[in-house]
C-alpha cells in the first residue's frame, strides 16, 4: 500500500480526529500537565494584542477553552528541525475584547489567530501565536 504524503494525511483528518485533538489541547489548558499548562511565545504580535486590548491570562484561558472544531484552519507537521514529528494546529475565531486607551470603549469583535504545537508525552502545550488575525 502506498504511503500518503503528509499534506494528504492532513486533508484526511476527520471532524472526529480534530475533536479528539482539540479535547487533548483543552484538557491541558484546563487541568495543567506536569506542573504547567501552557506557555505563549513572547513574539511581538502576541505582545501587541495585550497592548491594544484588555486581555488577562484568565481571558486567554477562556478563549482557548472556547475553541471548537469549526475554528480549525489547518493541521500540519512542524518545520522546526529540533521538533520533527510535532503537529501544529491553527485556529481562527472572533472574540469580544475591550480596546485600551479609548475613553468609554465598548467591546469589539476581534479576529484572533491562534497557532499551537500539540505536545507529545511529557511536554507542555506551546502556543506560537495568539494575536490579531491579519
Language-model segments: which ranges?
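Short beta-strand segments that buttress and anchor functional surface loops
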Residues: 89-105
Amino acid at each position: 500500500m502506498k504511503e500518503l504524503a503528509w499534506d494528504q494525511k492532513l486533508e484526511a483528518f476527520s471532524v472526529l480526529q480534530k475533536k479528539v485533538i482539540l479535547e487533548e489541547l483543552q484538557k491541558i489548558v484546563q487541568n495543567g500537565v506536569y506542573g504547567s499548562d501552557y506557555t505563549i511565545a513572547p513574539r511581538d504580535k502576541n505582545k501587541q494584542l495585550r497592548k491594544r486590548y484588555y486581555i488577562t491570562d484568565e481571558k486567554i484561558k477562556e478563549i482557548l477553552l472556547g475553541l471548537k472544531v469549526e475554528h480549525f484552519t489547518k493541521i500540519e507537521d512542524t518545520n522546526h528541525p529540533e521538533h520533527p514529528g510535532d503537529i501544529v494546529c491553527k485556529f481562527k475565531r472572533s472574540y469580544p475584547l475591550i480596546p485600551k486607551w479609548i475613553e468609554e470603549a465598548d467591546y469589539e469583535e476581534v479576529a484572533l489567530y491562534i497557532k499551537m504545537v500539540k505536545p507529545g508525552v511529557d511536554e507542555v502545550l506551546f502556543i506560537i501565536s495568539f494575536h490579531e488575525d491579519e
